[in-house]
Amino acid sequence: MTILDSIILGAIEGFTEFLPISSTGHLIVASEFLGLEQNAINKAYEVIIQFSAILAVIFNYKDKFSIKKIDLWMKVFIAFLPLAIIGFIFSTQIKELFSLHVVAVMFIVGGVVFLIVEKFFINEDEKTIYEVEAISLKQSLIIGFAQIFALIPGTSRAGSTIIGALLVGLSRKASAEFSFLLAFPVMGAVTAYDLLKHYKDFSEANLIILGVGFVTSFVVAYLSIKLFLKFLEKFTFFFFGVYRIVFGVILLLFFN
């Protein structure tokens, strides 16, 4: 991996992690395009850029990381549990799903779901929840079950949680923000596990590349969160649905 590769992958991770378009899917495609192998060193790199994306959430939502918000974080934890349990039980089977074909198909499926939800299930005027603090434990759990679909490569963790949140009555902005906060325990757990698994793969030889990826991912993720919320003030998720379908079709045509 070169420094340019590190910048490209760091930017892709930072930009896509919190959007409903699957950061994992984009990283898999980008790695294939750049000719990068899925070896231990490159896996360690992915751990670093995921960790920096987590920090972007903390910096964007410093006011949420307070003892006064314990009720909110209890709901976030409830939403985290289904994915944690299912992911742990079926970890081996999930790893076997990683392929460009699966990613492409799930891009298309996710895009169609977004279009259907936007067309038939959302009327922003009827939404009753505009702040993440107002979400109930039951709604949190339902969102958590929706997040299970993110275990399939190409589905998108953000996409599945946002769809779940929209269907239980959150506004578009509140759905996105709850997805951001839910990323903290999910990505935190995954990153901690991967760090323990790959810590021996970190060496002085690739510290510069790791550092470049870390900074790039953090800066882009920080800006991406802000731009995404601005986007949702004027637009719907229709664009993301169309993008997912087009991207998935392109993958099927050119990588199969």
From Swiss-Prot:
UniProt family annotation: Belongs to the UppP family.
Catalysed reactions, as listed in the record: di-trans,octa-cis-undecaprenyl diphosphate + H2O = di-trans,octa-cis-undecaprenyl phosphate + phosphate + H(+)
PANTHER family: UNDECAPRENYL-DIPHOSPHATASE
Localization in the cell: Cell inner membrane
Something else known: Bacitracin is thought to be involved in the inhibition of peptidoglycan synthesis by sequestering undecaprenyl diphosphate, thereby reducing the pool of lipid carrier available.
GO aspect biological process, one term: response to antibiotic
InterPro entries in the cross-refs: UppP (IPR003824)
HAMAP family per record: Undec_diphosphatase
UniProt keyword terms in alphabetical order: Antibiotic resistance, Cell inner membrane, Cell membrane, Cell shape, Cell wall biogenesis/degradation, Hydrolase, Membrane, Peptidoglycan synthesis, Transmembrane, Transmembrane helix
Any single GO CC term annotated in Swiss-Prot or TrEMBL for this entry: plasma membrane
Name of the protein this chain belongs to: Undecaprenyl-diphosphatase
Transmembrane segments: 1-21, 39-59, 70-90, 97-117, 134-154, 176-196, 205-225, 235-255
Function: Catalyzes the dephosphorylation of undecaprenyl diphosphate (UPP). Confers resistance to bacitracin.
Pfam family, one: BacA
Annotated membrane topology: Multi-pass membrane protein
Organism of this sequence: Sulfurimonas denitrificans (strain ATCC 33889 / DSM 1251)
Main location per the UniProt record: membrane
EC number: 3.6.1.27
Listed GO MF terms: undecaprenyl-diphosphatase activity
